[in-house]
């Protein structure tokens, strides 16, 4: 069962979604298959990340991503895919990175749940 979100939060998410690039799980899988460089960033909270993550994902929670992304060697034109639980927090974070000058940022619609459903990731046992 999904979480119930406030109308203001949902409005913020929709504004961000209108301003960013999104990909679905099929498009994400194609990005992985095409062999190009891709930086995957998990923007979930630490306890969510600890429970399981996409293999090789960098963990930069939504609360610190703007502050900490430049601590990592990621070029402004690198293909970056952000994910959270379902695609809401990652959309907001993607908008922030776009404003910071990163030009090839995507939010994975469906997030962690879509990764697990597609067998691209699994929760820790």
Predicted segments with their positions:
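Rhodanese-like catalytic fold shared by cysteine-dependent sulfurtransferases
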Residues: 1-39, 46-79, 88-125
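Short, surface-exposed ligand- or partner-binding patches at beta-edge/loop junctions that are enriched
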Residues: 82-84
């Amino acid at each position: 069962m999904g979480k119930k979100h406030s109308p203001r939060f949902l409005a913020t998410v929709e504004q961000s979604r209108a301003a960013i690039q999104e990909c679905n799980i099929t498009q994400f899988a194609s990005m992985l298959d095409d062999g190009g460089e891709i930086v995957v960033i998990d923007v979930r909270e630490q306890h969510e990340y600890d429970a399981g993550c996409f293999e090789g994902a960098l963990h930069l929670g939504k609360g610190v991503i703007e502050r900490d992304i430049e601590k990592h060697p990621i070029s402004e034109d690198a293909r970056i895919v952000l994910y959270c639980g379902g695609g809401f927090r990652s959309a907001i974070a993607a908008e922030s990175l776009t404003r910071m000058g990163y030009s090839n940022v995507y939010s994975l619609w469906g997030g962690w749940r879509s990764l697990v459903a597609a067998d691209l990731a699994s929760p820790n046992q």
